[in-house]
Amino acid sequence: MMLKTAVRLSLLACCSAVLAAPATAQTPTPAPAPAPAQSAAAAKGTPPPPPPLLQIEREEVRPGKGAAHTANEAAWAAAYAKAQSPVQWLGMTTVSGPNEAWFLTRHESFAALEKSDASTDANPALSAERDRVAAVDGDLLTRSSTILARYRPGLSYQPAVNLPSMRYMTVNIMRVKAGHVEDFLEGWRMVVEAHKKATMDEHWAVYEVESGMPDTTFLFLYARKSLAEIDASGPMHVAAGYRDAMGESGRRNMNEASRSGIEMTQTMHFRLRPGMSNLGKEWAETDAFWAPPAAVPVKTAQKK
């Protein structure tokens, strides 16, 4: 029970930077584009801060349709590449639980999001291909939804990470009870300060949902190079350094705030999927993991 509690605390106390995009809706061409998933400078060692606005396309895939869905997502990327659209997104699929695919894209504001959508609609060829691929998606999914969430820097800790080097993303969904939001915010600011004091080797970004999920829902996002990081996360939060930084009263107050103020939590682990993403060439230049798969040569029958 103690280990389970420690692991859960670690999941509630860490998460990391985001970027990327949706497999539907979003799409600019001539008008102001959303900020790129990660700039070349960022990929080379200066990670950008999390975007002010995050858009998430959440898709639930029908049983047995995973391979077909993966192939159709590649068609999305091909359509945007052909149209030379600046829209970029990061695709990822669940490691456990229901078969879901999430597509994340960054925006500077709601105005930028609106211009992005308008510019895609103004491109007839891209719009037509988008509608065609979306129709195929409809036969592969049981449900899809769009989530818009705003970045909360005061609740985040060392959020800028070198995303091209990451392979997994954990999302912890927390819904706060009405009337308890201020206590929740105060508690998490205390967690951030304790992490700073203990110089914890963690990174997370927090987003508050604006639409697409119930109000007072917060998303804690953290990127991982390996799932093995989860093994170290639990013990790290019960070690003396962090316990001293939180203090006995801090731990007691945080536990009480969680019991009385949190309506629900859900933790989801995702694997990042290059083939379902549409990212800048700097990603592949930084890490070959993101390079498009080489075309398989077609063998022709030899003449007899």
Where are these regions (language model features)?
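Bacterial N-terminal signal peptides that target proteins for export
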Residues: 1-13
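C-terminal segment of classical bacterial N-terminal signal peptides
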Residues: 14-25
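Short S/T/G/P-rich N-terminal loop/turn motif that feeds into the first structured element of a domain
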Residues: 25-304
